[in-house]
Amino acid sequence: MSALLREEDLNDFITPEVACIKPVSSKPSNGVDGELSVGKEPEKVEISLADCLACVGCITSSEEILLSRQNQDVFVKEWNEKKTEGYILSVSIAPQCRVSLSQYFGMGVLKFDQMFIRYLQEVWGARYVVGIQEGREESIKLMNEVADKGERKICSACPGFLMYCEKKQQDLLPLLIDVKSPMEITGHLLKDGNKEKMYHLSIMPCFDKKLESMRPESIGLVDCVITPKELVNLITPEQVDKYFATTKETIGMLEWEDAIQRVTPKWMNIDTSFKTNEGSSSGGFAWQYILHRRFQMSDNDNDNAYKIETVRGRNLDVTEFRLIDEEGKILVRSTQVFGFRNIQNLRRLVKDVKPRKLKRFIRKRPTANGNDNSISLSSSINNQDNNNTKVEEPVDFCKSDFLEVMACPRGCIAGGGNLKNGIKNGPDQDSDPNQDLNTVYMTSIPMTSIEPRHNLTLPSSQENVIVGVISHDLDDSNTIIKLQEEQKYGNKYKRKLYNPSSISETHNGDSKNTIEQPVQFTTW
């Protein structure tokens, strides 16, 4: 990273006594207690720059205060107060956390879901327990629609990457898709449909989600965020024996669905909540975008006209999906970019691209009746002619129409709040625990498909306009799509991106700059 110190970096401080919070695991000793080993030096502990970005442990003073308001002790204290005031408890949990906790307790994911719901109901009195899939589906659909307009192309539900852009790489902000994360939209779905006072606890794989819940546009959607590492501290040994004792017992889909149905709000989708979609264990945004574009371009009579090819990058954390026509030409690309090293490469490549090259173009294809049907596609960032692009080309971030970025190597399944080892026996030392969790994620959580948003009824004069697909001969098509989005969603699902240089400085002695006004903090 650059050693240069910029003026805007000086408007906050890190307290001197704050040490790195990155946990360091130690290998068990084979010696007897009290026995000294001569001639061996202890191994030096190394924490890489990649760890630091994913961890965001070196937090500012304001972020330290915010984080202190989001932990398991705060949840216990606040919920004990709120329930006496007539509040109901709702809990949302990310699928990565369900996988991590199920492996920690040594049971299958479906069995864990059943026992976890029972634990929350009997111990904490939870009224509703939901997954975040419905919120994720709304997030994916909206991100696809924003990306279709061609101005923004970087998608990230990762608060670590978002804060990195806002603090250090403001030049990337115009490319970020301004849609809220699945956690935040789940908060909207829970609270907007409920008439009672609700306390919302969310269990997330990443500590940075705590800061995300305190963003100005998200305050009130999630009342407290904890991670699996903090959740297990709430569970007593007696409760482990009662609810989470290691077992090979499995349950069927009907029993699993029955458990979910009892705790799903009537205004949310029972069939979706605890499932997941195709793609990666981080949400599959890049994969879903390429499916979305294939749907737009495919004829009902010829669904096999386009195929999707997966191309690996130089390391496991870069994957590109390519939509290819029958002649082998690449039409659309979407790319997964995980980990700090790849983010640095992305930053260097995208930083040099001039804004004038962010254009849109129209690709025409014949329809079944022989007429031309124009579909608007996002151009590659360097506006190259995709007709001349060959399938054999290596992965190139600058040619991608859609980028899914996560700070952690391996993505959200490797979030810092997830548990790495089981309650009794950890995974094989020679295996990659993140890869193990990824395999469990993709094979154990029931899958659901995301229906394309194409069924809105339009006036006959606009019959050739579909949400996210713009006909070139309609001058007011952008207005139509904007009105459709605002009619269905308003602006509540939009993300506000903050550039520190545009935020007014905090003046000494100004008592108004408190936690209750987070926009005044230099956190964002």
From Swiss-Prot:
Binding, [4Fe-4S] cluster 2: 158, 206, 408, 412
GO CC annotations, alphabetized: cytosol; membrane
GO BP term, example: iron-sulfur cluster assembly
Protein keywords: 4Fe-4S, Iron, Iron-sulfur, Metal-binding
UniProt-listed Pfam families: Fe_hyd_lg_C
Entry-linked InterPro entries: Cytosolic_Fe-S_CAF, Fe_hydrogenase, Fe_hydrogenase_lsu_C
Region: Disordered, residue numbers: 362-388, 501-524
Binding site for [4Fe-4S] cluster 1: 20, 52, 55, 58
Gene Ontology molecular function: any one: 4 iron, 4 sulfur cluster binding
Biased composition (Low complexity): 369-388
UniProt family annotation: Belongs to the NARF family.
Functional summary from the UniProt entry: Component of the cytosolic Fe/S protein assembly machinery. Required for maturation of extramitochondrial Fe/S proteins. May play a role in the transfer of pre-assembled Fe/S clusters to target apoproteins.
Name of the featured protein: Cytosolic Fe-S cluster assembly factor NAR1
Origin species: Vanderwaltozyma polyspora (strain ATCC 22028 / DSM 70294 / BCRC 21397 / CBS 2163 / NBRC 10782 / NRRL Y-8283 / UCD 57-17)
Gene: NAR1
